[in-house]
Amino acid sequence: YFYPLYLSSFLFWNKKLDRPLVLTSRVKRFLGILIGVTFIMIALTLSSKNSTNIFIFAPLILTYAISTAMEKIFFISFKHKAKQRYQSINNLKTVAITASFGKTSIKNYLYHVLKNKYKTYKTPRSVNTIAGIVLDVNKDLPLDTQIYIAEAGARVQGDIEEIAMFLEPEICVIGSVGEQHIEYFKTLDNIIHTKMELLKSPKMKKGFVHESVPIKDYPTITKYPNNLHIVKSNLDGIWFDVEIDGKIEHFHAPILGNFNAINLTAVILVSHYLGMSIEEIQKALQTLPQVEHRLQKIEAGGKIIIDDSFNGNLEGMLEAVNICSTYTGRKVIITPGLVESTDEANILLAKQINENFDFVILTGSLNTHLFSSNIDKEKVYILKDKSLMETTLARTTKVGDLILFANDAPNFI
């Protein structure tokens, strides 16, 4: 009776999600093996007069063992095929980017600038694992690519080194490093050492490293932001100056957030290193598109919506709060707080929200107690069912309001 009960519970849970579960090929293979092993076990059990419930979990255990072995064999083959295809591309230059936060933004911004001069390709969406990169190289990397921009993420030490050894990037970018994913690495030192694995690339010629990373001075390493000066930052964009080759250069981009000036400093330095002129870079930044769900400004129904739902770090969320504070009208925020962080960070965030927002909608129950204790009670509304978010916003907001979606989380959080 265990498996019918488990399956029913799974289907009920999946139906309640605002984003239903997608079954990948790997999951389908796993389920196929599980069903096969289960039927074999049932047949053996029914044919035996002395059957017991002692082996009730045997199908799961056997399926896991068989599936793990199969997937490892498949992956070794896929990886070898991807390496051959990757090495067959003549004169390819690869830029690999890692950071605790901001790596996807840097990748997207760099792609927008470089594509104006070179045949450029980037890993899609937030793909940043060795498995995702191998799949991308095998299926989608064009053979006429001149510059390949890849994002490198990690859950354990060694993940980024594996990516570095596979891609062997000539240019390595290490962005801001902080306590994001501290639950995986336990200490900030472990996070820093893991990010620095990118510099082990056998073919690295140049590295651009954020000043938050404690690294010695090397001829091949440039630390950034170098004499960055933010002139102005508001809901219309950012204006900033950067020192390049001993000269102060002026830049403007129609995206939001002081931290994006830091991300763009890395983009400017890499683009200039790869042969683009300052004028070409300045022109490209003028048309820089907003990154979806990362301080994306949308105007609809007489309201200003700031979609920052993919931003889950303290610095980024504080910056979103700071930008919204420049708005003179009524301000509303929808957030679950910080999901992968400390109580201290959530308390700091809650206090800043309390100072700058008129109404706070808390989604989920993860940080409800912390936020309710640090935000004026009359401002707080706890939304337990996210499917009611649209009707709640229609009821609690009006024309002229600014609405910030900050680190929105799925129901199961």
Each language-model region and where it sits:
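Acidic-glycine-rich active-site phosphate/pyrophosphate-binding loop
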Residues: T104-N108, K232-I248
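Short glycine/threonine-rich catalytic loop with a Thr-x-Gly-x-Asp
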Residues: L235, I255-A266, E292-R294, N313, ...
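ATP-dependent carboxylate-amine ligase
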Residues: Y1-K72, K203, H272-E279, K283-I305, ...
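Short, polar loop motifs at secondary-structure junctions
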Residues: V209-I215, N226, G364-T368, P410
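Phosphate-binding loop of NTP-binding sites
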Residues: Y1-E211, I215-D217, I268, H272-L274
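Beta-strand->loop->alpha-helix junctions that form or flank phosphate-binding loops
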Residues: E211, D217-L235, A253-N258, Q282-T287, ...
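A conserved, hydrophobic alpha-helical segment in the catalytic core
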Residues: F166-E179, P214-D217, F251-Q290, L318, ...
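Glycine/Thr-rich phosphate-binding loops of Rossmann-like dinucleotide-binding domains
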Residues: G158, I182-E183, D217, I230, ...
